[in-house]
Amino acid sequence: MRKINSALKPLKGDVSVDADKSISHRAVIFSALAPGKSIIKNFLQANDTLSSCSCLRQLGIKIAAMDSEMQVYGRGLSGFSEPHTVLDCGNSGTTMRLMAGLLSAQPFLSILNGDESLNQRPMKRIIEPLGIMGANIQARQNGNYPPLVIRGNRLSGLSYQLPVASAQVKSALMLAALNADSETLLSEPQKTRDHSERMLTAMGADIAVNGLEIRLKPGKELQATEFLVPGDISSAAFFMVAASIIPGSELLIRHVGVNPSRAGIIEILNEMGARIKLENERTISGEPVADLIVSHSRLQAIDIDGAVIPRLIDEIPILAVAMALAEGESTVRGAAELRVKETDRIAAISTELAKMGADIRERSDGFVIKGKPDSLKGGRVASKGDHRIAMSLAVAALAAKGESVIEDSEVVNISFPRFWDLLNTLTS
């Protein structure tokens, strides 16, 4: 539980957010597939990414942790050992889905399990296409929900149109495709984060990307490499919005990943009237990186849907906070995927912001918010066990009148362990 009072002064300073969760997951998993030592600098030491490390260690991969650096001693595409126990993915959907793709072709039995939240998340979206490739995966409720029981099998490539825009599904199929006996062609309905494609390209995989199509040919051994993980734009988003809504604020957020497939939050906030500038733009380990300068502004309402949704799907809860304090009516459509995240994020953010005085109405695939500056009041709100809901409500509390209490606040450790310390530093 955390008590948060209205911000009494502008947020000013030079900050760095925790490392990118998506890239950290992929870096450690792909490194396990490359023979030799890979080095991952600025690896995110959070509950979700450590679940991936734990699963890989149970599969025989040596991973040495040195401060924020990980040294991974990969054993090749076929170098894994049969686990002696169930592989615990914790709360991490990325761990479970990517590991399912990796394990589908391994010549042994493995079982993937998660916590109560993860075991309610849909898995048929990976089980069906992996099954077409030849995978043998069983799951609860007619193949819908974890635990997953995987009996390794010989896989064939496939040509597949993804029914949902999901980078986790795409990445699971790409991992399976590395061990298939023929080429795989994947087509996305909308562009999703492309960290897997960039990383596999850098590691020497035979992969070609053309718009929404990905073509991957098996047979090439991945090369061990060194990664430097940038700051997570999804974590930076909380401070982008905080600086935008607290009068007089100006923050410099250093070393943030600004991959175009993830940077929808910057574009949409700027369209709302935010003042976010990118400086010192560079490319590090194949990923675009920049320093962000964010200062206070009066925000205007906006409607979002379509192709931008996958590019800011994780940022929609904090975007709802910005919309609640913007002038006018905002609408989010096409975001039904939020209902099957760690919690039903549409219901969670709608219910909890309403407790703080927001005029918000749920839709099946989003919400409508009638925003008004200075409209929020303090209250007792719940994270629903979801890290992004907790951090979004914390930012809302800074702009609300009076004290707020956030229940189950330590859930931020899933993705951003330093969140509360950083927030306290900026507001003390």
Curated annotation (Swiss-Prot):
Pathway: Metabolic intermediate biosynthesis; chorismate biosynthesis; chorismate from D-erythrose 4-phosphate and phosphoenolpyruvate: step 6/7. 3-phosphoshikimate binds at residues 21-22, 26, 166, 168, 314, 341. Phosphoenolpyruvate binds at residues 21, 93, 121, 168, 345, 388. The active site is at 314 (proton acceptor). GO terms for biological process: amino acid biosynthetic process; aromatic amino acid family biosynthetic process; chorismate biosynthetic process. Disulfide bonds: none annotated. Catalyzes the transfer of the enolpyruvyl moiety of phosphoenolpyruvate (PEP) to the 5-hydroxyl of shikimate-3-phosphate (S3P) to produce enolpyruvyl shikimate-3-phosphate and inorganic phosphate. This is 3-phosphoshikimate 1-carboxyvinyltransferase. The gene is aroA.
